C-alpha cells in the first residue's frame, strides 16, 4: 500500500499559497485493508475513507468511464492494480494532476510526480486539460472558471478553451444539475477576483446556458455620466470584484451580481436610461434563484437590494419620513444585520464604476444614524399607552420613528 497527496495540495504548495484542500490517493489497497487500519468508508460511488485521526479523505486509486450525460454519468473501476499515473490521468487539469508520496508519519517524501507537465503549466500560468476525457464531465467547465477567479493571472490554454466550447455546443452544460451549478458559482463568488470566473464562462459560451440573465448584461449601455464604464456587464463585474476586495459575504456578492439584471430587458428605444429596472431585476431574480436552488439568505438579500438600491443611492435627498418608509419596506427595523449587508451591496454598486472605486458614499453613514434612531423607539411602551387599537398603535409608532430620525439627523448634520 502506497499513499500519495494529490491535486490541490501539491499545486498550492508549489505556488507558495496556503493549502486549501488535502486529498490523498491510496495505491495497492482494497476496501477491506483500509477498514482493517481504522479508516471509515464514506464514498457512495467509489471507495473514499476518512482517516481515523485526521478525518481527511483518502480515496482508492481508480479509473472512470463515461456512461451517460451529466455529472453522475460515470462508471468507476478501482482495484489494487490501478496505478497512480492511471488515477492522475482522469483528473481535469495538468496543474491538478501531480502527486507526492506520503510517509507513514504523514510527511511528504520524494519528488513531485508530474506525468502531465503540470509544473510547466504552473510556471506559465496556464489551465490545460490532461486529456480529451475532460469532455466527459461538464462540471469541469465550471471548475476551470472558478479556478480563474482564484488564480486571476492564469489563462485558459487555447486547446482547452476550444474543448470547452465544443462541450457547450454539444449540450453538456445543459446536463449540469442546478445544485452543482450553484455550488461552483458560489465558490467562485467567494474567490479573490470573481469577474474572472464570468469571463471564462462567457468565453466558452457556458454563461448563456447556466446564467443567461447575467450573460445578457454585456453590450447593454448605461448613461456615461453615472457609469463611465458604460457597459452594464462590465459594471456588474466591477461591483462584484469590489465586494470581493472588501471581503463581503456570499449574500452580498450574489446581490452585487444580480442587482441590475433588469437592465438587460430595458426597451431599446429608451436606452441608455433604465427607468424601472429595479422591479424588472426582482422579477428575474426570483426564477433564477428557484432554478438554481439558491439559499434563502442569498435570495432574500438579492431581492431587497435589487428593489431598493436606487432608493439607497438617493437617501441624501430623503427626509425622515421617507427614510422610515424605506426601513419599513426593507424590514430593516427587524433585520438590522441584513440591512447592513444591503449597505455593503449598495456601496459596492456605487464604487464599482470606472475611476470611482474610492469615491465617498455618505449615504451609508446617514442610513446607519437614521436606523439606530428609528430602532430606539419603544414600540411596546407606545402600545401600552394606547390600548388595543392596532391602527392607532401602528400610526403612533411610525410617527415616533420619524421624530427620532429627524432629531438624530439634525444632531449628525
Curated annotation (Swiss-Prot):
CDD domains: NT_ClassII-CCAase (cd05398). Magnesium is required for nucleotidyltransferase activity. Its cofactor is Mg(2+); Ni(2+). The keyword tRNA processing applies. Keywords: ATP-binding, Hydrolase, Magnesium, Metal-binding, Multifunctional enzyme, Nickel, Nucleotide-binding, Nucleotidyltransferase, RNA repair, RNA-binding, Transferase, tRNA processing. Monomer. Can also form homodimers and oligomers. Comprises two domains: an N-terminal domain containing the nucleotidyltransferase activity and a C-terminal HD domain associated with both phosphodiesterase and phosphatase activities. Belongs to the tRNA nucleotidyltransferase/poly(A) polymerase family. Bacterial CCA-adding enzyme type 1 subfamily. CTP binds at residues 8, 11, 91, 143, 146. It catalyses: a tRNA precursor + 2 CTP + ATP = a tRNA with a 3' CCA end + 3 diphosphate; a tRNA with a 3' CCA end + 2 CTP + ATP = a tRNA with a 3' CCACCA end + 3 diphosphate. The gene is cca. SUPFAM superfamilies: Nucleotidyltransferase, Poly A polymerase C-terminal region-like. Residues 232-333 form the HD domain. Its EC number is 2.7.7.72, 3.1.3.-, 3.1.4.-. GO terms for biological process: RNA repair; tRNA 3'-terminal CCA addition. It comes from Burkholderia vietnamiensis (strain G4 / LMG 22486). Catalyzes the addition and repair of the essential 3'-terminal CCA sequence in tRNAs without using a nucleic acid template. Adds these three nucleotides in the order of C, C, and A to the tRNA nucleotide-73, using CTP and ATP as substrates and producing inorganic pyrophosphate. tRNA 3'-terminal CCA addition is required both for tRNA processing and repair. Also involved in tRNA surveillance by mediating tandem CCA addition to generate a CCACCA at the 3' terminus of unstable tRNAs. While stable tRNAs receive only 3'-terminal CCA, unstable tRNAs are marked with CCACCA and rapidly degraded. Mg(2+) binds at residues 21, 23. Gene3D superfamilies: Beta Polymerase, domain 2 (3.30.460.10), cca-adding enzyme, domain 2 (1.10.3090.10). It holds the Pfam family HD. ATP binds at residues 8, 11, 91, 143, 146. GO terms for molecular function: ATP binding; CCA tRNA nucleotidyltransferase activity; cyclic-nucleotide phosphodiesterase activity; magnesium ion binding; phosphatase activity; tRNA binding. The keyword Nucleotide-binding applies. This is Multifunctional CCA protein. A single active site specifically recognizes both ATP and CTP and is responsible for their addition.
Amino acid at each position: 500500500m502506497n499513499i500519495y497527496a494529490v491535486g490541490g495540495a501539491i499545486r498550492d504548495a508549489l505556488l507558495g499559497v496556503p493549502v486549501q484542500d488535502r486529498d490523498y490517493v491510496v495505491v495497492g489497497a482494497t476496501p477491506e485493508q483500509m477498514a482493517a487500519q481504522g479508516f471509515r468508508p464514506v464514498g457512495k460511488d467509489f471507495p473514499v475513507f476518512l482517516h481515523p485521526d485526521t478525518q481527511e479523505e483518502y480515496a482508492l486509486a481508480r479509473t472512470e468511464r463515461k456512461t451517460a450525460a451529466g455529472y453522475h454519468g460515470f462508471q468507476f473501476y478501482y482495484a489494487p492494480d490501478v496505478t497512480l499515473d492511471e488515477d492522475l490521468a482522469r483528473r481535469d487539469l495538468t496543474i491538478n494532476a501531480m502527486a507526492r508520496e506520503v510517509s507513514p508519519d504523514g510527511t511528504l517524501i520524494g519528488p513531485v510526480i508530474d506525468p502531465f507537465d503540470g509544473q510547466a503549466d504552473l510556471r506559465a500560468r496556464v489551465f490545460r486539460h490532461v486529456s480529451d476525457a475532460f469532455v466527459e464531465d461538464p462540471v469541469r467547465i465550471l471548475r476551470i472558471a472558478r479556478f480563474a477567479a482564484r488564480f486571476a493571472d492564469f489563462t485558459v490554454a487555447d486547446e482547452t478553451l476550444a474543448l470547452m466550447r465544443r462541450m457547450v455546443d454539444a449540450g453538456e452544460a445543459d446536463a449540469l444539475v442546478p445544485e452543482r451549478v450553484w455550488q461552483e458559482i458560489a465558490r467562485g463568488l467567494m474567490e479573490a477576483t470573481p469577474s474572472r470566473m464570468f469571463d471564462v464562462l462567457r468565453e466558452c459560451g457556458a454563461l448563456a446556458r447556466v446564467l443567461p440573465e447575467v450573460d445578457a448584461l454585456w453590450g447593454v449601455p448605461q448613461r456615461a455620466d453615472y457609469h463611465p464604464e458604460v457597459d452594464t456587464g462590465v459594471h456588474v463585474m466591477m461591483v462584484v470584484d469590489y465586494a470581493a476586495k472588501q471581503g463581503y459575504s456570499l449574500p452580498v456578492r450574489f446581490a452585487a451580481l444580480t442587482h441590475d439584471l433588469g437592465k438587460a430587458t430595458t426597451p431599446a428605444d429608451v436606452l441608455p436610461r433604465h427607468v424601472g429596472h429595479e422591479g424588472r431585476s426582482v422579477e428575474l431574480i426570483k426564477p433564477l434563484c428557484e432554478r438554481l436552488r439558491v439559499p434563502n439568505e442569498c435570495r432574500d438579500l438579492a431581492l431587497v437590494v435589487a428593489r431598493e438600491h436606487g432608493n439607497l443611492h438617493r437617501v441624501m435627498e430623503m427626509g425622515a419620513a421617507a427614510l422610515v418608509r424605506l426601513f419599513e419596506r426593507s424590514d430593516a427595523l427587524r433585520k438590522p444585520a441584513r440591512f447592513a449587508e444591503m449597505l455593503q451591496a449598495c456601496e459596492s454598486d456605487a464604487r464599482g464604476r470606472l475611476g470611482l472605486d474610492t469615491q465617498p458614499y455618505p449615504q451609508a453613514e446617514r442610513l446607519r444614524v437614521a436606523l439606530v434612531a428609528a430602532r430606539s423607539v419603544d414600540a411596546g411602551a407606545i402600545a401600552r399607552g394606547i390600548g388595543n387599537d392596532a391602527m392607532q398603535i401602528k400610526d403612533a409608532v411610525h410617527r415616533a420613528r420619524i421624530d427620532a430620525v429627524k432629531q438624530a439627523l439634525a444632531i449628525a448634520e
